[in-house]
Structures are given as structure tokens and as C-alpha cells.
């Protein structure tokens, strides 16, 4: 009898409250993505989806698609699907690699052109935590 309880203790289904999406090498500069990320940080998911849908910015469409992916990841682990109590806990945007080119400039010189890529990580949580910044 005790061995059965011992086995159930280790094989219990864990309840996940967080969900993460980590996307690498997005063709958009980190500066453009951070402008949008500052608007939706620490907000409800429904409210932030509404903002991202209506924003006219390159980063808005990119973050909108990734946020939908995070929500679907969260729904895979949670049984009770309710979007009303999900919050965006963290949005981390870092610089990826740079593609460097040389463009012809005036008087025979060459000007550097840097195409910047970025890395994005979004964490959503069902419990609201007062994390300001990050």
C-alpha cells in the first residue's frame, strides 16, 4: 500500500503556471523591438494582443505572432483554458548577430552597413507578480 503512494508521488502531473517562447535571429533591430516591448511589459495578455494588433510598427507584428505562440504553449500544459488571468511576466530582447556589408561612399570610400538581428524571449504567467523593469 505504501509503495503505491510512493509511486504516485513521483508521477504526479505538475501544474505549470509559466510558459516560455525563445526566438533567435529575428530580422529586426533590437531597438525597434524594445519600443514595442516596453508598451506590453507587465500587462494582461488580452490587452497586449489588442495593442499589438493595432500598432503600426515592424516589431508589433513580430511580437504579436510570438505572443500567440506562447499562449498556445501555455494551453498545451494547462487544462483550464482562461486567457483572462494570464500576464506577461518578462520580455527580454537582446542583440543577435550583425550582417556587415560595405557600401560605396563618396570619393571612393566605403561605408559600413550593419544589418542587426535580435533575440526575443517572452515569459507569461498565470499569477501576477510586480516585476518592474526587466
From Swiss-Prot:
Domain of life: Bacteria
One Pfam entry name: Ribosomal_L22
A biological-process GO annotation: translation
InterPro entries per UniProt: Ribosomal_uL22, Ribosomal_uL22_bac/chlpt-type, Ribosomal_uL22_bac/org-type, Ribosomal_uL22_sf
Assigned keywords, A-Z: Ribonucleoprotein, Ribosomal protein, RNA-binding, rRNA-binding
GO CC terms, sorted: cytosolic large ribosomal subunit
GO molecular function, one term: rRNA binding
Function: This protein binds specifically to 23S rRNA; its binding is stimulated by other ribosomal proteins, e.g. L4, L17, and L20. It is important during the early stages of 50S assembly. It makes multiple contacts with different domains of the 23S rRNA in the assembled 50S subunit and ribosome. The globular domain of the protein is located near the polypeptide exit tunnel on the outside of the subunit, while an extended beta-hairpin is found that lines the wall of the exit tunnel in the center of the 70S ribosome.
Subunit relationships: Part of the 50S ribosomal subunit.
UniProt record similarity statement: Belongs to the universal ribosomal protein uL22 family.
Name under which the protein is recorded: Large ribosomal subunit protein uL22
Organism from which the protein derives: Karelsulcia muelleri (strain GWSS)
Species lineage: Bacteria, Pseudomonadati, Bacteroidota, Flavobacteriia, Flavobacteriales
Amino acid at each position: 500500500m505504501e509503495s503505491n503512494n510512493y509511486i504516485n508521488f513521483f508521477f504526479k502531473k505538475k501544474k505549470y503556471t509559466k510558459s516560455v517562447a525563445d526566438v533567435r535571429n529575428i530580422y529586426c533591430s533590437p531597438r525597434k523591438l524594445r519600443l514595442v516591448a516596453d508598451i506590453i511589459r507587465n500587462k494582461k495578455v488580452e490587452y497586449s494582443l489588442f495593442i499589438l494588433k493595432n500598432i503600426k510598427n515592424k516589431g508589433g507584428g513580430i511580437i504579436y505572432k510570438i505572443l500567440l505562440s506562447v499562449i498556445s504553449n501555455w494551453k498545451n500544459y494547462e487544462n483550464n483554458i482562461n486567457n483572462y488571468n494570464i500576464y506577461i511576466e518578462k520580455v527580454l530582447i537582446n542583440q543577435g548577430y550583425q550582417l556587415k556589408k560595405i557600401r560605396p561612399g563618396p570619393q571612393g570610400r566605403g561605408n559600413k552597413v550593419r544589418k542587426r538581428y535580435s533575440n526575443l524571449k517572452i515569459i507569461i504567467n498565470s499569477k501576477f507578480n510586480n516585476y518592474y523593469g526587466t
